[in-house]
């Protein structure tokens, strides 16, 4: 459902999609929504990602030309970043200029990565503005879906449940590595 405050649509409580923020007021509205990380897909705005960083957001910049789709390797790297950001509890916005085709392509690939399969992903995107908008984008999703496969061991989900607190492990590791270096 679109947020009235910043014109983003929340896919989950940690993942939103929308158009490129084109003013400091829109960036402030994103902050007030709790968004702290942005995946910027805009190739047409060469400095927008820097403005977003300066505004205090963590930014993953993957420039994709309008009406095109990312290369499979770039898509995989972007989805790995997105998985990590969501796992770490960050609220992430995925955007291109208008929040439609490129945004929808990456979102659809993320749904497939989370195990939803083409049918469930299609149902999730059905009433959303963000979805692949042309043949190249749909073809990329089809290829990605074949590569990724479908989850059969557990129920697919977009929610990150049972997050693991790594702090005790990291503290032990720091202590051990300190002893080894001495």
Feature-to-residue mapping (PLM):
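Cysteine-dependent PTP/DSP-like catalytic domain, specifically the C-terminal lobe
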Residues: 88, 106-171
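Ser/Thr-glycine-rich phosphate-binding loops at phosphate-binding pockets of nucleotides
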Residues: 103
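Secreted peptidase-domain scaffold signal
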Residues: 180-182
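Conserved G/P- and acidic residue-centered "switch" motifs that form tight phosphate/ATP-binding loops
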Residues: 99
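Cysteine-based protein phosphatase catalytic domain of the PTP/DSP
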Residues: 4-91, 112-114, 118-139
